[in-house]
Curated annotation (Swiss-Prot):
Protein name: Preterminal protein
Signal peptide extent: none
Site positions (Priming of strand displacement replication by covalently linking the first nucleotide of the new DNA chain): S549
Subunit structure: Heterodimer with the polymerase; this heterodimer binds to bp 9 to 18 of the genome. Interacts with host POU2F1; POU2F1 binds to the auxiliary sequences in the inverted terminal repeats and tethers the pTP-POL heterodimer to the origin DNA thereby participating in the assembly of the pre-initiation complex (POL-TP-DBP-NFIA-POU2F1).
Domain of life: Viruses
Homology family: Belongs to the adenoviridae terminal protein family.
Positions of short motif Nuclear localization signal: 328-337
Compartment list: Host nucleus matrix
Annotated Gene Ontology cellular component terms: host cell nuclear matrix
Gene source species: Snake adenovirus serotype 1
Length: 610
């Protein structure tokens, strides 16, 4: 038997190579050595599956006279069958941080190819895996602590930020915001802290360092933005320090507290910063949500040197400052791969925007015309806004570069472009003057639900579609995603269902769910009850509704449920897998099975006679 085939079966069945060689496995039912085996029929394989408890024993070490096969119902030999791919499926499902997993009984079907007369036995199993996200943490924090909103945002950052950036890594999947919240619910929202156990999560020291720095950069940026419209801080901070000013900036502002100002502005800025990164496709220049208001400077600028303006100097040296920060970290840089065109595209993305570009539309003044005052640093409103925007652009690029050092497979997969679409919706709502507190809360809640959905579907796609061995040997009969919104009493508020039978089911489901959520989020402030047929038809058209995707009434129920009412969201992933049944050609194993079967039937008959 070929070594390559043994290695493939080892990964699919979990059995040792020595056991597989001893087993002499084949999946061809026309093989003369197994043509008349009792398990070659559906009735026979079902009996063997029940008697030897295949759902459990197929996950164990079945080597001859091993710890498992020495005990009944075995007689020292492996069972006559191995379920090719079953072990792989169970291992992949168990490796993900689901809260609950349910596996159905294994069913068997005999398949016959009429054209070639090939026969094979196929196993099938339905898995249902789920976890919960505590979306109510947002509304509990924001709605109940409006008097201390600055402190509340700090709590949200501490409770959510690390959970947020872990989804960018995708090495170890995240269970959801609920995991962070549940650990500290007994102490209340004010007790939120972040102490991620990276070794337990199987995150390397390198990635742990990157994740912590991404966290610090985002905290520094949200604090800087919330302080920007305000007078300088009591302790004056000289900027831009030196060519390595980014390190001092992150160190200073990550330890500061957000300014307590308008709640909608604060939460909106927080939501925007949270979407920053390579997967969001968002540049720092897009962060000016309130045109013309971010004009203050929470620090003192140093005077121009050699008649060179500070902002223009920072813009020219932005890339150098970003790289200097990353080079200062105790990590080995990832070697970039890709075509020449991809490298050129990345370089163009990292190029600082020219003056006047971006939503702010503020043109940078000429260097010789930029003026400063001794105390504040910049005298003109446009100059201060331009400087602020350059700081945001620089930190935004730094976040993007840090995330580039993480797992590149997530960016290439296409499973994380929802951030860009959701952020685009946020800007659209702002332009339409619809960015109310309720809308922001709904957007933020839906964003995190989408993030966990994307992370899970990305993982499943990598395991069962992108993996060549799994794709060739494991069938994907259908995939279904079920979302249940619950109140704080556990009452079910709405249930959403998405279903697909294609081989690329996970990617198809992802695209449909993102489009669905965009439409639901955009309509969150609507007052219509969707009673008129034309209103329902328009709603379904906007969502690109597909049959077998749940009741239309449930869609409307989700729309009419306020974010504060949804305390938690349960995400369930139901997948039906299939694979071939392997048969042993070893006559020793075959004779052992016949003896075991005859003994079992004899015991059953004696029990019937008593």
């Amino acid at each position: 038997m070929a070594t390559r085939q043994i290695e493939a079966w080892h990964r699919l069945t979990g059995q040792r190579p020595q056991t597989l060689r001893y087993f002499m496995m084949t999946t061809d039912l026309n093989n003369r050595r197994i043509l008349r085996q009792r398990t070659a029929s559906e009735a026979g394989i079902r009996w063997a599956s029940r008697y030897f408890e295949y759902p459990v024993t197929q996950l164990l070490d079945l080597r001859p006279f091993g710890p498992v096969t020495r005990n009944p119902p075995f007689e020292g030999e492996p069972p006559p069958n191995l379920l090719v791919g079953y072990y792989y499926v169970m291992k992949a499902i168990n490796a993900y941080l689901f809260d609950q997993r349910t596996v159905s009984n294994i069913s068997y079907n005999l398949q016959l190819a009429l054209a070639t007369n090939e026969r094979a036995m196929v196993w099938q199993v339905l898995t249902d895996s789920s976890y919960s996200i505590d979306t109510g943490a947002f509304s509990r924090a924001l709605d109940g602590n409006t008097e201390d909103l600055g402190g509340t945002v700090v709590q949200i950052q501490n409770a959510v930020m690390m959970d947020r950036v872990l989804t960018s890594l995708t090495v170890t999947p995240v269970r959801g915001l609920g995991a962070v919240v549940r650990e500290q619910n007994n102490n209340g929202i004010a007790a939120f802290t972040v102490r991620p156990n990276f070794p337990q999560a199987r995150v390397s020291k390198r990635d742990a360092t990157l994740l912590r720095n991404i966290c610090e950069c985002k905290k520094a940026l949200i604090n800087y933005i919330t302080w920007s419209p305000c007078p300088p801080l009591p302790c004056q901070l000289d900027l831009p320090f030196n060519d390595g000013w980014v390190e001092d900036f992150v160190r200073h502002f990550s330890s500061a507290s957000p300014m307590e100002n308008n709640s909608q502005n604060l939460v909106g800025d927080f939501a925007a910063v949270m979407t920053m990164g390579k997967q969001a496709g968002m540049r720092g220049g897009a962060l000016t949500l309130r045109s013309g208001t971010q004009t203050g400077l929470p620090m003192r600028l140093r005077q121009r040197e050699g008649r060179r303006a500070v902002t223009a100097t920072m813009r020219r040296r932005r890339g150098q400052a970003v790289q200097s920060f990353i080079d200062s970290l105790p990590i080995r840089r990832r070697r970039r791969r890709g075509t020449r065109r991809q490298v050129e595209r990345e370089d163009s993305v990292r190029e600082p925007p020219s003056p006047g570009e971006g939503p702010s539309g503020i043109r940078a003044p000429e260097e010789e015309e930029e003026s400063f005052s001794d105390d504040v640093g910049l005298s003109r409103e446009d100059d201060r806004a331009d400087f602020n925007q350059e700081v945001v652009d620089t930190i935004g690029q730094l976040i993007e570069e840090l995330e580039r050092e993480l797992n590149p497979a997530a960016e290439e997969s296409g499973f994380f472009n929802f951030s860009q679409r959701m952020y685009g919706l946020l800007l659209q709502l702002q332009r339409e003057n619809r960015l109310t507190f309720q809308m922001i809360l709904t957007w933020l809640s839906n964003f995190f639900v989408l993030e966990h959905l994307a992370s899970t579907l990305f993982y499943l796609n990598e395991q069962f579609v992108r993996n060549g061995l799994a794709r060739r040997n494991i069938g994907l009969q259908f995939a279904q995603v079920i979302l249940r919104g619950r109140s704080d009493t556990g009452r079910e508020l709405y249930t959403r269902v998405w279903y697909n039978r294609e081989r690329e089911a996970f990617h198809t489901l992802y695209d449909r769910i993102v489009t669905d959520f965009i439409a639901v989020t955009e309509m969150a402030d609507t007052e219509t009850m969707f009673q008129a047929p034309e209103e329902r038809e328009q709603l379904l058209a906007d969502m690109q509704y597909v049959e077998n995707s749940g009741s239309v009434d449930e869609v409307i129920a989700q729309l009419q449920t306020r974010a504060q009412q949804t305390d938690s969201v349960e995400l369930s992933f139901r997948i039906k897998f299939s694979g071939l049944v392997g048969y042993s050609q070893n006559p020793v194993i075959q004779r052992s099975f016949e003896r075991t079967r005859e003994a079992a039937i004899g015991r059953w008959r004696r029990q019937q006679q008593q």
